[in-house]
């Protein structure tokens, strides 16, 4: 009889603990997405460095040092950190284009980015992208011609930033009152492949360095192979 009573007491305590802990877990979950949005809103509220036809001063196994004096005056440079595989595609005295998001602010002589480097391109082009938007699985208006790229070879960093900027301006995806809790961009190419970009990824401490480090791979795409992009947002 005593054994049965003990079992009942243990059961009651367990139920009470579960009912007490559950709201806490739910609350923490909401806090997490709130922090993620705050991190991303701060990180991507930024003016990118957009420089054309700059000379590579020197390269290391993981860094390109790029002369930007003609844009900034004085002895100024861009330091782009990237993977070994990406850095080996460039060498001293190459001319490159830069589109990058800084992760160190107020440096006196240099600007620090991850990736964001393509061979210099002098031809003037206007690639108006075809795009679709889905919210909670339902197709919305198409986003054709909303995103424009002015180079034949671009980094995923540039595509990512310009699409995010459009979503931040028009759908307020990172605002505190935004209903969106997850989302992704899918980049489709003409060979049927798709590359995904997580719109709600804020790793580690959520600093600009943490968030932008994914661009170290300096992934690029030739716009001749670009098909379209799809955006999926979830409430």
Curated annotation (Swiss-Prot):
Entry keyword Signal: yes
Gene Ontology MF terms in the entry: metal ion binding; toxin activity
InterPro entries in UniProt: Enterotoxin, Staph/Strept_toxin_CS, Staph_tox_OB, SuperAg_toxin_C, Superantigen_bac, Toxin_b-grasp_Staph/Strep, Toxin_bac
Residues holding Zn(2+): 194, 228, 230
Highest taxon listed in the record's lineage: Bacteria
Keywords linked to the UniProt accession: Metal-binding, Signal, Toxin, Virulence, Zinc
Cellular-component GO terms for this entry: extracellular region
Signal peptide range: 1-27
Family: Belongs to the staphylococcal/streptococcal toxin family.
Summary of the function given for this chain in its UniProt record: Superantigen that acts as a causative agent of the symptoms associated with scarlet fever. Has been associated with streptococcal toxic shock-like disease and may play a role in the early events of rheumatic fever. Superantigens cross-link major histocompatibility complex (MHC) class II and T-cell receptor (TCR) molecules, resulting in an overstimulation of T-cells associated with a massive release of pyrogenic and inflammatory cytokines.
Record-given protein name: Exotoxin type C
Protein's organism: Streptococcus pyogenes serotype M1
């Amino acid at each position: 009889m005593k054994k049965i009573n003990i079992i009942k007491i243990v059961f009651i305590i367990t139920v009470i603990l579960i009912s007490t802990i559950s709201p806490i877990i739910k609350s923490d979950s909401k806090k997490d997405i709130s922090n993620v949005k705050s991190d991303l809103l701060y990180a991507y509220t930024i003016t990118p460095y957009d420089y054309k036809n700059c000379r590579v001063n020197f390269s290391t196994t993981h860094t390109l040092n790029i002369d930007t004096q003609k844009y900034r005056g004085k002895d100024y440079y861009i330091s782009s950190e990237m993977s070994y595989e990406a850095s080996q595609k460039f060498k001293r005295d190459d001319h490159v284009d830069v589109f990058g998001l800084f992760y160190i602010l107020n440096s006196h002589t240099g600007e620090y980015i991850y990736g964001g480097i393509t061979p210099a391109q002098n031809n003037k082009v206007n690639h108006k992208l075809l795009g679709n938007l889905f919210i909670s699985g339902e197709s919305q208006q198409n986003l054709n011609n909303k995103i424009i790229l002015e180079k034949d070879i671009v980094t995923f960093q540039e595509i990512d930033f310009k699409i995010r900027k459009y979503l931040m301006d028009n759908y307020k995806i990172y605002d505190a009152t935004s209903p969106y809790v997850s989302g992704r961009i899918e980049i489709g190419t003409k060979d049927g492949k798709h590359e995904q970009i997580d719109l709600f990824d804020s790793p580690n401490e959520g600093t600009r360095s943490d968030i932008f480090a994914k661009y170290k791979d300096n992934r690029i795409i030739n716009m001749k192979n670009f098909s379209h992009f799809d955006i999926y947002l979830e409430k």
